[in-house]
Design a protein with these regions (language model features):
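Exported/periplasmic cell-wall-interacting domains
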Residues: 279-282, 306-309, 318-325, 332-425
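Short alpha-helix capping/helix-loop boundary micro-motifs
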Residues: 60-65, 146-152, 224-231, 408-409
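Boundary regions of SH3-family modules and the immediately adjacent low-complexity/disordered segments
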Residues: 24-44, 91-139, 178-213, 256-285
């Protein structure tokens, strides 16, 4: 399995200690002092991140393990300071929960920090960026928009390459888009990606009574009998159903999904309720992936709260393209990550995608992520990862721990906020 990580994730380290507020600082201010009593500049309310995916450390040390990463251009709050040292000639700034940044890696600011929920965005289609595919003629990417079509390109992008466009400018009557990786591409060579509107269902109560269609046309029967003929109106693919009644056994099980409307259990995907893993604490959140039904259910303790369809790895257990069974924990969460040798059987036409959205790795390079290049959920399809619709990936990203603070692009767990439990069965 070949993937390139957008950010390096390091081993967990010891917990850091926050700074101490100045005794004479007014309530609600951001005025802090160092442990040694050296005052922090008055009036500073935030720190402006000057590079994208700026690493944040677990401790105020140059060799500390990674805690997460921050988005370039955002203002993060300053909660405390520590003296600099080896690897940091200035002060260490506490900019989030157990998250330290050397002062010379950012700019002090009197402006207000980014408000909670200010980033990443939450668009209605579930995609944090605007995504495009390179058309069949390929295209060229340039380091600066001034060079576009007038100088040697930085890269050649083949058909099927996908990228996130975060800015557009016009030059000579032509429109050019800047990718999140800083390259400028002619918009005339790009085709917009269209995300599916499919999303899972919230589960009410303790009963897991939801099912999903995954066939192009799911037959509906007037009664639960093998001799019954289907009605004239089959159900379309990727539709949520409430199971009102179940009857039959073996291969002849039927679900009633409406008045006089029955579907065969073999024609739909219905997740089975499962007890929490043995490692789960009482009431702890966890996620269940059922390979047989290609479904995912999010739980709080024994109670299911959300269910949806997924696409898992198509390989046999033990191979590189399988979604590995067992109990895991999410070890890093990334708003986006670049992947090649794509998580899909159509890798020949889509060989690489930049900024795949809402990635949560739980078994080395296997994890959850949003998928906008196919909508074949409910079927085995990927090269190992658990593919979700963008809306489901966004929901799951918000549901699981560790929480991503506003303005961060990635976060690693801590002792106080471990990664969510994931069981694949």
């Amino acid at each position: 399995m070949s993937r390139r990580f957008a950010r390096a994730a390091l081993a967990l380290a010891a917990l850091s200690t926050p700074g101490r507020a100045s005794a004479d600082a007014p309530e609600g201010s951001m005025r802090w002092v160092q442990t040694g009593g050296v005052p922090f500049p008055a009036g500073v309310k935030s720190v402006l991140i000057t590079r994208d995916d700026q690493p944040l450390a677990r401790e105020p040390r140059g060799d500390a393990a990674r805690r997460g990463s921050a988005l370039g251009g955002v203002a993060l709050p300053v909660y405390g300071v520590r003296p600099g040292g080896v690897g940091c000639p200035g002060r260490w700034l506490l900019v989030g929960p157990q998250a330290w940044l050397c002062q010379n890696q950012a700019q002090l600011s009197a402006g207000e920090p980014l408000a909670p929920g200010g980033w990443p965005p939450r668009p209605p289609d579930g995609l944090p960026f605007r995504y495009y595919f390179v058309g069949k003629g390929g295209t060229q990417a340039y380091a600066r928009v001034e060079f576009a079509d007038d100088a040697a390109p930085e890269r050649e992008l083949e058909p099927g390459f996908a990228l996130a466009i975060v800015e557009e400018r016009t030059k000579g009557g032509q429109s050019y888009g800047r990718s999140r990786r800083g390259l400028w591409v002619p918009m005339r060579d790009l085709l917009p990606a269209r995300a599916t509107s499919f999303r899972g269902e919230a589960v009410e109560g303790d009963k897991l009574d939801v099912a999903f269609t995954y066939l192009d046309k799911t037959p509906v029967y007037p009664r639960p009998e093998p001799s019954a003929r289907p009605t004239a109106a089959p159900l379309k693919r990727l539709r949520s159903l409430r199971v009102l009644e179940e009857t039959g056994r073996g291969g002849g099980v039927y679900y009633r999904v409406g008045e006089g409307e029955w579907v065969r259990a073999a024609d739909v995907r219905r997740p089975l309720k499962a007890p929490p893993p043995a490692d789960a604490l009482p009431g702890e959140k966890w996620v269940d992936v059922e390979l047989a039904t290609q479904t995912l259910v999010a739980y709080e303790g024994p109670r299911p709260v959300y269910a949806t369809l997924v696409s898992t790895g198509r390989g046999a257990q033990g191979t590189d393209t399988a979604t590995p069974r067992g109990v895991h924990r999410v070890w890093v969460k990334l708003v986006s990550s670049t992947m090649d040798n794509l998580e899909d059987e159509d890798a020949a036409s889509h060989y690489a995608i930049e900024d795949v959205p809402y990635v949560q790795f739980f078994a080395k390079a296997v994890g959850f992520h949003g998928t906008f290049w196919h909508d074949g959920f409910g079927r085995v399809r990927s090269h190992g990862c658990v593919n979700l619709s963008p809306l489901d990936a966004q929901w799951l990203f918000d549901f699981t721990g560790p929480r991503l603070p506003a303005g961060w692009t990635g976060v690693l767990p801590t002792e106080f906020e471990p990664g969510v439990l994931v069981r694949v069965r």
